[in-house]
Regions:
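Short beta-strand segments
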Residues: 66, 153-159, 207-209, 246-248
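C-terminal active-site-proximal or functional interface alpha/beta core segments in diverse enzymes
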Residues: 212-274
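A short small-residue
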Residues: 22-30, 205-211, 248-254
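Non-membrane alpha-helical structural segments and their capping/turn regions in soluble enzymes
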Residues: 39, 43, 116, 135, ...
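A charged N-terminal "starter" segment
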Residues: 1-153, 189, 193, 197-198, ...
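Active-site/ligand-binding-proximal alpha/beta "capping" segment
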Residues: 158, 163-204, 208, 217-229
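Glycine-rich tight-turn/loop motif centered on a GG-T
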Residues: 31-35, 124-129, 168-182, 216-221, ...
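Conserved radical SAM core fold
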Residues: 71-75, 93-95, 116-118, 160-176, ...
Length: 274
């Protein structure tokens, strides 16, 4: 039988197994409903990403686990052990990660509706990067950083105007997305110029996210090209140096038998050529 994941199998007794564990036995021991995950598979996925980062970027980068997949202390401890970074989108996820002992400097704080309390929490705990989504958040963060005597390292979420060829419900890189600032109409350029003049902020990089469940390399390559051109323009026009490019988007996985995912490392290889 061709399962959607390699860690699934059917045992001699006809029961489904996950990572070699009989699910009927797990149900008897722990009850149902239950979420069952294969730790070995999760760790191997992390290692595939990290090996690709080492091979194609000489280790000059960081792979981030998306907390929206599952936010709990055990997962965060695994991510720490596998030398991953994480992204969080709420004070709750940030709190859980910190309680798990995850290094604050490897946390990226995303989200398009951060509260002042959440921004303060990030500043107080020395979160590595705050990914700014809009002008209102930018002004709030600059004010709070000044009041607290901090300098925040920030990235901006950019809408690159990319069609990721995925379902409309999970597209995020198009011009009319509710997330981030637009590249096409000059909004992204203007907000970065504004931030560059703010005393309490350090503009480190730019970020984009083009959607989820993407089975093609081309949208990621195109996004990387547009973002690199934007970075070069900022340097040429305003002498603003962008040191980090954070490329986001969900690589396709096999939900159904008809899905044909690309090996994770192929995405990283393709983007590295840009």
């Amino acid at each position: 039988m061709d399962f959607v994941m390699s860690c699934l199998s059917v045992g001699e007794n006809g029961n489904l197994s996950i990572g070699g564990c009989d699910v009927a036995t797990l149900a008897e021991e722990y009850g149902t409903p239950a979420y069952i995950m294969d730790e070995d598979q999760i760790r191997e996925n992390c290692r595939v990403y990290n090996r690709a980062m080492q091979e194609y970027y000489g280790g000059n980068g960081i792979v981030l686990y998306a907390s929206k997949a599952l936010s709990c202390k055990y997962i965060y401890r695994m991510m720490k052990e596998e030398n991953m970074g994480i992204d969080v989108v709420s004070g709750g996820e940030m709190y859980t990660a910190l309680k798990a002992g995850f290094p604050a400097e490897r946390i990226y704080f995303h989200g398009n509706n951060k509260t002042d309390d959440e921004l303060k929490m990030a500043l107080e705990n020395g979160v590595g990067r705050i990914v700014v989504d809009n002008v209102f958040e930018l002004e709030s963060l600059n004010r709070l950083s000044g009041e607290m005597g901090k300098t925040a390292d920030i990235l901006f979420r950019i809408k690159p105007g990319i069609d990721a060829h995925t379902h409309s419900f999970i597209r995020t890189g198009q011009i009319d997305s509710k997330f981030g600032v637009s590249l096409e109409n000059g909004e992204a350029e203007n907000i970065i110029k504004m931030a560059d003049d703010m005393e309490n902020l350090n503009v480190v990089g730019v970020h984009c996210h083009i959607g989820s469940q993407i089975f093609e390399l081309e949208p990621f390559e195109l996004a990387a090209e547009k973002m690199m051109t934007f970075i070069a323009d900022l340097k040429d026009k305003y002498d603003i140096s962008i040191k980090e490019l954070n490329l986001g988007g969900g690589y396709g996985i096999k939900y159904t038998e008809g899905d044909t995912p690309i090996d994770y490392d192929k995405y990283i290889q393709a983007v590295s050529k840009v």
